[in-house]
């Protein structure tokens, strides 16, 4: 498996990552084995944006025994509430959701602490100097989060993050289901160049 340097983190990650979405829809042991199989083939980065307890527990059991072989992305603001996914910046929900993530993944740290799903410039501005962002910085200072990343689908917001000085990597989908048949816009190509050659 070929690897690449991930953003400004210095981490050497596999060119193919493991996205854990929909793991909970499959038999538990089958999903755990799939994660272990991916690791045996050289995949070393896994995204855990999903807040549902089953998905998190599956990933925890899948990386158990070889945690040091994985770079784990954990998202701040992706919470499980009323038996469904919710996106929030409310610290009364964000903190317990992150603590649950650590517990279910059976780990003391997250390699990539992700600012979860920022798709508007207004929201980007709102989280600056917020308790939400300060919490992530505090966890990075303590070593609980090794690097700070962000997920977005908006090129303007992603560019602001790339230039922020503290976001070290971006999870940015250039293919969204709603636009998968349209050509990639020039602004997206410019953003990718900025991320690869800051």
Question: How would you name each of these model-derived features?
Answer:
Residues 1-74, 141:
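N-terminal binding-site loop/beta-alpha segment at the start of enzyme catalytic domains
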Residues 5, 13-17, 44-45, 69-73, ...:
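Structural preference for beta-strand elements that scaffold enzyme active sites
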Residues 19-29, 79-95, 121-125:
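Active-site mouth loops of central-metabolism enzymes
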Residues 23-29, 47-57, 81, 121, ...:
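Acidic-and-aromatic substrate-binding clefts and catalytic sites of carbohydrate-active enzymes
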Residues 25-38, 89-106, 152-162:
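Short, acidic/polar
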Residues 51, 63-92, 116-119:
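Structural motif corresponding to the early beta-alpha repeats
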Residues 100-124:
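Active-site groove signature of glycoside hydrolases
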Residues 118-198:
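Beta/alpha (TIM)-barrel catalytic core signal, keyed to glycine-rich beta->alpha loops juxtaposed to Asp/Glu
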């Amino acid at each position: 498996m070929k690897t690449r340097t991930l953003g400004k983190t210095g981490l050497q990650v596999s060119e193919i990552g493991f996205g854990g979405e929909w793991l909970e829809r499959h038999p538990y042991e089958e999903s755990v084995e799939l994660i272990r199989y991916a690791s045996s083939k050289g995949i070393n980065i896994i995204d855990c944006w999903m807040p549902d307890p089953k998905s998190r527990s599956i990933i925890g059991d899948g990386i158990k025994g070889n945690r040091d072989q994985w770079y784990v992305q954990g998202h701040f603001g992706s919470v499980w509430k009323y038996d469904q996914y919710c996106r929030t910046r409310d610290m009364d929900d964000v903190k317990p959701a992150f603590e649950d993530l650590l517990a279910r993944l059976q780990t003391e740290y997250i390699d990539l602490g992700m600012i979860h799903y920022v798709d508007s410039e207004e929201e980007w501005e709102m989280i600056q100097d917020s308790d939400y962002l300060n919490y992530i910085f505090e966890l990075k200072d303590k070593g609980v989060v090794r690097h700070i990343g962000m997920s977005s689908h908006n090129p303007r917001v992603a560019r602001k993050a790339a230039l922020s000085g503290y976001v070290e990597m971006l999870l940015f989908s250039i293919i969204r289901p709603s636009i998968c048949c349209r050509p990639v816009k020039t602004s997206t190509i410019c953003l990718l160049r900025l991320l690869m050659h800051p």
